[in-house]
Amino acid sequence: METDFSLVRKEEEEEEDNRNGMSYLSMEMMKKVSSMAAPMVAVSVSQFLLQVISMVMAGHLDELSLSAVAIATSLTNVTGFSLIVGFAGALDTLCGQAFGAEQFGKIGAYTYSSMLCLLVFCFSISIVWFFMDKLLEIFHQDPLISQLACRYSIWLIPALFGFTLLQPMTRYFQSQGITLPLFVSSLGALCFHIPFCWLLVYKLKFGIVGAALSIGFSYWLNVFLLWIFMRYSALHREMKNLGLQELISSMKQFIALAIPSAMMICLEWWSFEILLLMSGLLPNSKLETSVISICLTTSAVHFVLVNAIGASASTHVSNELGAGNHRAARAAVNSAIFLGGVGALITTITLYSYRKSWGYVFSNEREVVRYATQITPILCLSIFVNSFLAVLSGVARGSGWQRIGGYASLGSYYLVGIPLGWFLCFVMKLRGKGLWIGILIASTIQLIVFALVTFFTNWEQEATKARDRVFEMTPQVKGNQKTQIIVEEDTQVLLNHIAETV
């Protein structure tokens, strides 16, 4: 009789969850995920375009400037920006689950402690950038290009520090599901960046130095705008009582999760840069590198778009796990996967339909366009796989699976993908196609790993782990009372303050 009663209770709970829109695939959850993903697309694109616009304006100076800025952008992404993004990925877990558990003081502790850690790390990155020309000489780059690239990298250091503060602040709002401040600040920074970059590069004759400085000013403007929103947010009251002990304990939790998070993100990011370097070793390196660059750019633009769904999935999964709602967390996962699949179909069908003409967006050379057309089917498969991979990576960050993701990235890309790509490219004579097939297989392996982990996960157990993580060392933390906070009032408080000022 006891077993029967338990079964009845379980069925009643599932029926109630279904009525509340918490079935394994619910329209309500899809609306939540998509409503957050839409503005995050604008945020991601706005931040992505800052470096692209500076590169385009520098490219119109002369061919030498374009080469130097392109190489510097690639190396600074590998040695700096990618690491910051990777470390900040730990906050997707920590801040999101803390908000779900209503431990609001911990959100501020995690945010501030991560800022301190990342700022200290930035100084070591800056030293590397000061000697960028020496690093480029190791790869036998042209001395003049190396000097210009080093000069651009040095003047990009202020942008690195601004970007370092921007990432935790973005996670601070994202973990609460507040997207309006992110949308306004990133769009405002982009609108400022375009004329300001033009002014520095062309009118004031700063050249590539102006292109680098404009990125720094734009990042710091974004940080300033987000700080204003944060200063007048409801959660700011919970952050005023933070002490040294709380910051140290939060710092330990952050570092423990930040290292595997950086491993998970950076190893995948770096593999594409290695792909580009390998294409330069081919006989017709100019053609091969051009086509691989076109594919990488197309894939990067698509990833910026689909990663917004992953960010939304990360937020909803972490919030629900922190709140102990394991069924809602699973519903968020399934809804995000469904939306990612829809986006994958639309993108791949569109790209394949225009496979004979999309290359003209990047080049007027018929040989380049013809080669791009040949590699498009492989690129479409890669984009299809990466659409689901971006979503499941977001689920992994929200669930705290960064360590699994790090090992998956290491094994799939560096033990399988890159060696296989080299074999297909140079031994089987498939050239650039072979390189891209290797990366495609690596992405597929990583996707399978994430899919298996997600499918066989006990979400009720994950919810328990999340709450254990959040409430770790909670007795020492002041200001973690379960205060009822309505996140929608954050923006309203700021607007009221502005209205009173005016």
Swiss-Prot record:
The keyword Ligase does not apply. Keywords: Membrane, Transmembrane, Transmembrane helix, Transport. GO terms for biological process: xenobiotic detoxification by transmembrane export across the plasma membrane. Pfam families: MatE (PF01554). GO terms for molecular function: antiporter activity; xenobiotic transmembrane transporter activity. It comes from the Eukaryota. InterPro entries: MATE_euk (IPR045069), MATE_fam (IPR002528). The chain crosses the membrane at residues 36-56, 68-88, 112-132, 143-163, 182-202, 208-228, 262-282, 291-311, 331-351, 375-395, 408-428, 436-456. It is a multi-pass membrane protein. It is found in: Membrane. The keyword Transmembrane helix applies. GO terms for cellular component: membrane. NCBIfam families: matE (TIGR00797). Belongs to the multi antimicrobial extrusion (MATE) (TC 2.A.66.1) family. This is Protein DETOXIFICATION 7. The gene is DTX7.
